[in-house]
Amino acid sequence: MRAIAINDYGTPATLTELPKPEPGPGEVLVRVRASSINGFDAAVAAGMLKGMMEHRFPVVLGKDFAGTVEAVGEGASRFVAGDAVFGVVMKPFLGDGGLGEYLVVGEQHGIARIPEGLDLQAAGALGLAGTAAVNAIDAVAPTTGEDVLISGATGGVGAIALQYAVAAGAEVIATARPGAEADFVHGLGAAHVVDYTSDLAAQVRAIAPEGVPAIVHLAGEAEQLAGLLAAGGRIASTLGFGPDQHPAAVAVMADPNPVTLDRLAADAASGALRVPITRTYPLEGTPQALADFTAGSLGKLAITV
């Protein structure tokens, strides 16, 4: 099978021919049709997870996947061949990924069916970013009329979190540079845009003099953001900023359980959630997609497998 893999720590991600995997007990074999680029993938490709997770080289990149079940292993019963599925690769080691034509995953976690109305490309860009966004918004639990500051609103997680905050009735203050970034977040429903390259605190205080009740920290300096909280406010961070650093902080780890994946898929299928794909690349274009992601990109960069 064709796959995008690295052969050692920090070596370039290249298109490689690898054996087709076989499902073991409780596993399903997915013919992958779509994936996307996440910060995790870029970190793995750069060798940044050396010593943090076991690497089984060649390491196929890609946390996200969407495709069709081709076969099931012994004892697997949630899915049958032909089911359209999507999800997040959740294994205790790095080696198997969604940026290959075939993928074996456990059937109990990190995988769900794709409903009618959701195409494979969108599903392939939804899993990890969508899960992180839902978990972060659930952690701060915005209510109608509340100001919510989303720092990192222009990325994949931020663009989805922004939409869920708006759906909850919140007034979203989104960080974005003037121009294309500001237009992007306004298009997703942001009520206010603050330029993170300027005096962020002054801009936020001009909108919310008493501070903001809720903050989603996806980028930027967490301590500076925490200083913008209103009394009794809460901050959710996907970057490790938690209660050890601030009593109002919750460190969020994306948990792609079937309930969350089903929620994301249903919202995307109904049109309530827009999967914010801004560019699509072929599998062999993944190295360019990684470079574009690292340089700074809007929304999600999708990969057709």
Please report, for each region that a protein language model flagged, where it lies by residue.
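Glycine-rich beta-strand-centered segment in the early N-terminal region that forms part
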Residues: 19-37, 49-91
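Rossmann-fold dehydrogenase core element
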Residues: 232-276
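C-terminal hydrophobic helical "lid"/dimerization subdomain
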Residues: 1, 261-305
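Glycine-rich cofactor phosphate-binding loops and adjacent beta1-alpha1 units
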Residues: 183-251
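NAD(P)H dinucleotide-binding glycine-rich loop of Rossmann-like/cofactor-binding domains
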Residues: 54, 78, 88-152
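Mid-domain Rossmann-like dinucleotide-binding core that forms the NAD(H)/NADP(H) cofactor-binding site
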Residues: 123-198
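Residues located in well-ordered beta-strands
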Residues: 2, 14, 31, 66-68, ...
